[in-house]
Structure formats: structure tokens, C-alpha cells
Amino acid sequence: MERAIQGNDTREQANGERWDGGSGGITSPFKLPDESPSWTEWRLYNDETNSNQDNPLGFKESWGFGKVVFKRYLRYDRTEASLHRVLGSWTGDSVNYAASRFLGANQVGCTYSIRFRGVSVTISGGSRTLQHLCEMAIRSKQELLQLTPVEVESNVSRGCPEGIETFKKESE
């Protein structure tokens, strides 16, 4: 039975669900440890009344295989070195290995999700398309993290990502 999560319970549950596998753990697709902000940092950078605001110190990403979800919060300061580091937070091999531990003979849904500065991207597919899903996820991650804050804000305020406008024009 599921329970509704409200207010501060959300943060408590997020802290409780953290997969702290050190530098990857045995089955985690991630090669970097969770870098979630401390309680003090969280309060400093977040408004309790606006639950939709992201902490500007980094971004959240997750991999899900069926009902098993691995989550990470990674620090990102928009420098080239930081970008290179966080792009290596997982690889196709580490995702395939983690998925193989949880996926049986049946096709199971696989999901990658990333949230950065109020923009959330989720990519889903079946376990048979995992390699293609990994390729799309790394491209999406790289493009999202390289957007300037102005580009992110304009996309959010327009209510759609950049590619959707192009698709609408081509389909008319």
C-alpha cells in the first residue's frame, strides 16, 4: 500500500532512499557516490515554501529497472572539469551490469531521469532497448548540463523544450 508524502516527509524519504554504494557499489549503475547537500546547505539554498525549486549546487539523476531505483545527487559547478566528471558518473557497461542483476527473462521497463535547474528529462524503454536508452540518456544529460541558465529559463517559461517547436513546424 502506498502512502502520500507531504512537506518535510518528502525530504526525509529522499534521504532514506539514497543508495550510498560508495563509488558504485556492487549493483549500482553509478560510479560516483551520492553528493547530496547537507541539511544546512539545503536550508541555505532552498525555500521550504517552493517545493519545485532545485538546489543550485548540482543535479539529481536516477536509473530505474522495474521497481528498483538508484538515485544520485551530484555536485556540478558548470566548469569543463566538473562536466567531464559528472558525465562519467555512469557508463553503458555499469548500467548494463546493474540492470542484469534485476532483469529476468521478461522485458522490464527501464527509466533514466535527470533534473537540473527546474528542468526534468525522463527517458523510458524496455530492457531489450537498454543500449539505445543509454545512448539517448548520455546525449540528453550532456545537452541539459551545457545549457546556460538563460536557455533553461526561456525553455521552461515557454513550457516546452527546444526540439518540440521544430517538430511542430516540420509536421505542419
UniProtKB/Swiss-Prot annotation:
The keyword RNA-binding applies. One of its GO terms (molecular function) is RNA binding. Keywords: Host-virus interaction, Inhibition of host innate immune response by virus, RNA-binding, Suppressor of RNA silencing, Viral immunoevasion. Coiled coil: none annotated. Pfam families: Tombus_P19. GO terms for biological process: symbiont-mediated suppression of host innate immune response. Transmembrane segments: none annotated. Residues 1-20 have a biased composition (Basic and acidic residues). Changing residue 39 to G: Complete loss of silencing suppression. Belongs to the tombusvirus protein p19 family. Acts as a suppressor of RNA-mediated gene silencing, also known as post-transcriptional gene silencing (PTGS), a mechanism of plant viral defense that limits the accumulation of viral RNAs. Binds to short interfering RNAs (siRNAs) with high affinity. Acts as a molecular caliper to specifically select siRNAs based on the length of the duplex region of the RNA. This is RNA silencing suppressor p19. It comes from Carnation Italian ringspot virus (CIRV).
